[in-house]
Amino acid sequence: MSKSHAAYIDYALRRTTNMPVEMMGTDVVRLKDYQHFVARVFLGLDSMHSLLLFHETGVGKTMTTVYILKHLKDIYTNWAIILLVKKALIEDPWMNTILRYAPEITKDCIFINYDDQNFRNKFFTNIKTINSKSRICVIIDECHNFISKSLIKEDGKIRPTRSVYNFLSKTIALKNHKMICLSATPIVNSVQEFTMLVNLLRPGSLQHQSLFENKRLVDEKELVSKLGGLCSYIVNNEFSIFDDVEGSASFAKKTVLMRYVNMSKKQEEIYQKAKLAEIKTGISSFRILRRMATTFTFDSFPERQNRDPGEYAQEIATLYNDFKNSLRDREFSKSALDTFKKGELLKGDASAADISLFTELKEKSVKFIDVCLGILASHGKCLVFEPFVNQSGIEILLLYFKVFGISNIEFSSRTKDTRIKAVAEFNQESNTNGECIKTCVFSSSGGEGISFFSINDIFILDMTWNEASLRQIVGRAIRLNSHVLTPPERRYVNVHFIMARLSNGMPTVDEDLFEIIQSKSKEFVQLFRVFKHTSLEWIHANEKDFSPIDNESGWKTLVSRAIDLSSKKNITNKLIEGTNIWYSNSNRLMSINRGFKGVDGRVYDVDGNYLHDMPDNPVIKIHDGKLIYIF
């Protein structure tokens, strides 16, 4: 039915031919073609009640949305605008962008942060104050977070955000309101998030049905047919976060580097104690204690089970202060720092004080030592992602930075009052090469809504639970024109994944998480393809054979059709002759996968999903006695 959707897109564009391409307030900005396109379609179809902006980081989702809000009154006089956002993002980018380009809509805007514990009450209180003659436009920024907070927990408890989700899914279309959801990563943790998002945008269209069988979509054609026009899809980088990507005129080159570091005997001893503690307390599935132990270890492992919280906190504070005091008035000599900046380690002729300090620091954290050496050897500015703030996280890392003489800012929950200003200073043109501030270390608080410019190296000290979060992290530094001020030879970003291993080189929890991420991504890639093929851009570019229409009366019927996956008509069992193979998507063999090559040259993954045809002259490497095809 994409031809039908194409006809409505064409109708919307014909209705909005005179819509200005510039947005003017206290400042003026000219929209990119893709921004102007999606705004014209959404505003040109008044009965298009909802839309997902699946736009990668840095291409201007916020700007596109503000333009749409500015022109809402082109289609109706009275609007109330409700923006559901994280608290950290209200001032910047939202309020700043509105005040700069559409100050006249400020009086119509209501900001509510969905991470507020009173979110539900605040939302419905504001709904009651809206004039009955006004239409409502709801904006949900980083909608994957809103969806995640609306999922029913495993214990069956309904979360407060769910009532807002239910209200929006029932009311937006019914009352002729509008809604825009924004995300660069619309699916993060589970397939259920896709179902929730679809039913928010197209209420009731995707009922309780299994989307996958043996990790393959049951009926991709049915989903694409019924969900046409669901989203706008602007994703220039469709590669895995673990793949290298060549640069372009607008985007920096990305190179992924896996840095494997072996723990010291002392660190491994604490790691094993952390593993036992997880088993005893029943939290081994979360791997938190082991993840912390791979990052940094004190001289002893503080047991938490069956202890008074205050007593435990006091022990942690004592261990931290002891370590901090051990570094008082100690730092590396200029000679040692010069050696590190050349990418070299201390030699035998180094001072005893430098060697002793380096040995002590490395015994407690091979990761922190490695990241400090990497920063000093970097030719430009650096980002460091460390999800833990206290105990063995950022608080300790900053002590390492001090000893290594690394200037830095911190973006975390500890710096709420100063972090926006600090990032602005870090991004200043005068700091393009990191002369004033070399590094920004950030926690999960910095994964969304902020931009960094002229970054050359990103160090990821701990794996997240999903590729989407990693994509958000890396996307902070590789954005549209993020390196425009950087010298041409430094328009690149090296992404370093620092993976701890046991002292004998055996894997740790870091590689467990790496495998979990790869497993999840198999299903997500297929759902992202559905988003792409149901997008306004894809339909407009690929569907040309349609009959023009002169009204939008049939749009609601077109997008209200229920999705039926019960027939499973695209699942067929077929025996294929061929041979088992090994393959990798990386020249550095970061991950090696089992696959199958049919006699016809088609290559499949271990679950039978078709990948691509075997090249005429494939690249092959030998690793551990295996022939590895590089695709």
UniProtKB/Swiss-Prot annotation:
Residues binding ATP, per UniProt: 55-62
Keyword Metal-binding attached: no
Domain Helicase C-terminal: from-to ranges: 367-532
Keywords, ordered alphabetically: ATP-binding, Hydrolase, Late protein, Nucleotide-binding, Transcription
Keyword hit for Transcription: yes
EC number: 3.6.1.15
Domain Helicase ATP-binding: 42-204
GO biological process: DNA-templated transcription
Record-level Gene Ontology MF annotations: ATP binding; ribonucleoside triphosphate phosphatase activity
Assembly notes: Monomer.
Family: Belongs to the helicase family. NPH I subfamily.
Chain's role: Serves two roles in transcription; it acts in concert with viral termination factor/capping enzyme to catalyze release of UUUUUNU-containing nascent RNA from the elongation complex, and it acts by itself as a polymerase elongation factor to facilitate readthrough of intrinsic pause sites.
Protein name (database record): Nucleoside triphosphatase I
Native species: Vaccinia virus (strain Ankara) (VACV)
Gene: NPH1
